[in-house]
């Protein structure tokens, strides 16, 4: 979907937004097998006296599709919590991951800056900075300075801690390893929001619906919007009926909840996310 104003189209941004910088990657690692049939089975159980095996046997592809359409139309979303999707996300900034983890009904595993050295950290350059040579030069200079500062502090702390551990009777190998970990813990305080991170995310379908409503919106910050759009594309490939109407609130609910802050592009946004159903 396209961002407001002069920002580039999200469909192109997955390939181009990080051009000249660190590339974002979103991978669907795994998901519940037969996701649509699982949802349909769970939902049908609520209204049937049949045993579960019989319910599953009676769910043809057409019946599953029909049942899911009905669930979505009446807003019966609790059966969708039985299906989860796990994503591997790389090449995003810490600024982006901080927004991501605010979606609380989910599971996250993120690369630690406490236990992993950032001695050569990659960073994400916003497109608006990338497009202006003067801003880009200043941004890169600051990243270089922060990297140098991080390494200096890490080395100073490593030497300090190593000396203390040796005095406590540790072996040289153990003292050095423990000193490095302890140094990373505090040296990371100088790292910028631009610092690249990696994270594994698991969400159930109901949570994904809520996530897409907020983060696929034109008013979402550009980076997490790009992540959300790519996650949605992958979900649509894996479970097209479940996610057929997924997207920002104006797509899922039929109207924009932003009031005076609306982007005013409801028709255009609906068209873009409708076309996403046909993209593989």
Regions found by a protein language model. Name each.
Residues 16-280:
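Family-specific signature for flavin-dependent thymidylate synthase
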Residues 2-10:
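Short, small-residue-biased leader/transition segments that mark boundaries at the very start
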